Amino acid sequence: EVKPNYDYLKPITLIHTNNVLEAMKVTIEKRKKELESPRSLCLFINRTDMILQVIEKLGLKKDSVVFCSSNSTTKLNEAGIKAVENWNIKEQKPFMFFTSRFYAALDIELKVQPDIMFVTEPYLYEYTIIDPCTDAVQAIGRFRNGVSSTTHIVSTNKDFPIRDEKGINEYIKASEEAYNTILRLYDCAPSLEFRNAYKAALDQLPFK
């Protein structure tokens, strides 16, 4: 187990809610009133379907850009939302959305320290769950000039499984085995439709 030998803790405002969208709306409106000078709000939401819903329902389309995988940019662009595959400061907008591929291995340098918002909605989008010990630390660390504030808006699901370290390791191992099994079937598929079916299954698995 790797443990840092320095203090890496960052202050985070935690907002627990049973209505994530409403909490985001209230928080964004409050921020707008309190903002003395313009700076971007960077939102980390690991599901493009949810990002699309948030942008449309909160009326943020003209002021937003989404940084996501190439598989998702087409869908978002067709919906009239600016979406790009790679980070570029020229794409900076008041609201910048990031999926998990931007949590690590990337330097984001902005002249003005942005506000950060993590969003977790396990009821509808399980993969939006943020790990405070890894995801949050890595994402905040992307901003080389620092951040102004960090907020985590989170809904909880009482039915979500709670695992100890042994359970986590077993789950990861089983997920990897399931992925590799379907991948072998995909590689040996006898027809295009078989490949499409296996590919759809691979895309739904938690292990990549």
What do these predicted regions represent?
Residues I168-K208:
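The feature captures the C-terminal accessory region of ATP-dependent helicases
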Residues N46-D49, V65-A83, T99-Y103:
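Conserved helicase motor
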Residues P94-I116, A136-G146:
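SF2 helicase motor core recognition
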Residues E1-R31:
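Interdomain hinge/linker at the junction between the two RecA-like core domains of SF2 helicases
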